[in-house]
């Protein structure tokens, strides 16, 4: 699945991704697959999966595409 980062607060370690087909999904820093400090920037295109979390659907296996 693809989407764009709506916002991400690196101090709090979470944010939201807007899915290409519509709707937002929660993303936690621990779901980001990259080396070093795991953070996202507004507008970045990402690929991800959706898993059921404690508080509902959330992004998993998040990879930056652009």
From Swiss-Prot:
Main location group: cytoplasm
Entry keywords, A to Z: Activator, Cytoplasm, DNA-binding, Transcription, Transcription regulation
Quaternary assembly: Monomer.
SMART domains in the cross-refs: CSP
Domain spans labelled CSD: 3-62
Domain of life: Bacteria
Single Gene Ontology MF annotation: DNA binding
Any GO BP: regulation of gene expression
A GO cellular component entry from the record: cytoplasm
Record protein name field: Cold shock-like protein
Localization terms from the record: Cytoplasm
InterPro entries from the UniProt entry: Cold_shock_CspA (IPR012156), Cold_shock_domain (IPR050181), CSD (IPR011129), CSD_CS (IPR019844), CSP_DNA-bd (IPR002059), NA-bd_OB-fold (IPR012340)
């Amino acid at each position: 699945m693809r989407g764009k980062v709506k916002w991400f607060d690196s101090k709090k370690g979470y944010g939201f991704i807007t899915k290409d087909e519509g709707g937002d999904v929660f993303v936690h820093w621990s779901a980001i697959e990259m080396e070093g400090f795991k953070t996202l920037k507004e507008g970045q295109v990402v690929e991800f999966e959706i898993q059921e979390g404690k508080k509902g659907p959330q992004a998993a296996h998040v990879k930056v595409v652009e």
